[in-house]
């Protein structure tokens, strides 16, 4: 946090610059992965990995950092699928400010790259060339629900902001 905060807020305090903190964080993360029982979740498909980490019906037997242990057999699961897909569940949606925190694929800040044009940019342009986790967090052009064949855009009857969450949404046999 300290490194990225200093980098994106232009803070230069005495001591170390932002690169020092980012390098220290990377070293600490590598130590945890190399020496601990944990590993990063990966199916070797970065366009789906982030979404699938949160959408599994049953917990993996592997030790992952940031994993939630759901078990369909033990009836330990969430209701996020229905919550994000049904209009009777409060119509959740992320704010534009939150969506703008997702970086571009090249690592640059979205709002820095597009200065003021981002404020009137069409949705399809706004989500183009972003960190792949954005398309695994909200419905973007080309979105297909897990196990479905039909492409679905954001359902404005279900999300009040237009940024419809898909994180935790499971396949079509789940509720919703």
What is each stretch, according to the model?
Residues 2-160:
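An aromatic- and glycine-enriched ligand-binding surface/loop that stacks and positions planar moieties
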Residues 152-176:
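Active-site beta-strand/loop architecture of penicillin-binding DD-peptidases
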């Amino acid at each position: 946090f300290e490194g990225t905060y200093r980098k994106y807020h232009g803070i230069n305090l005495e001591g170390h610059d932002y690169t020092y903190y980012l390098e220290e964080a990377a070293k600490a993360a590598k130590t945890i992965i190399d020496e601990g029982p944990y590993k990063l979740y990966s199916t070797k498909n970065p366009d789906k990995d982030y979404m699938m980490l949160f959408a599994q019906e049953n917990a993996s037997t592997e030790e992952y950092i940031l994993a939630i242990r759901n078990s369909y057999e033990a009836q330990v699961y969430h209701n996020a699928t229905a919550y994000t897909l049904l209009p009777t569940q409060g119509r959740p949606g992320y704010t534009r400010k939150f969506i703008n925190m997702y970086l571009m694929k090249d690592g640059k800040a979205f709002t820095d790259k597009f200065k003021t044009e981002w404020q009137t940019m069409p949705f399809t342009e706004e989500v183009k060339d972003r960190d792949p986790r954005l398309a695994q967090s909200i419905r973007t052009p080309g979105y297909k629900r897990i196990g479905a064949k039909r492409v679905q855009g954001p359902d404005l009857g279900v999300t009040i902001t237009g940024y419809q969450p898909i994180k935790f949404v499971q396949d079509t046999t789940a509720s919703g």
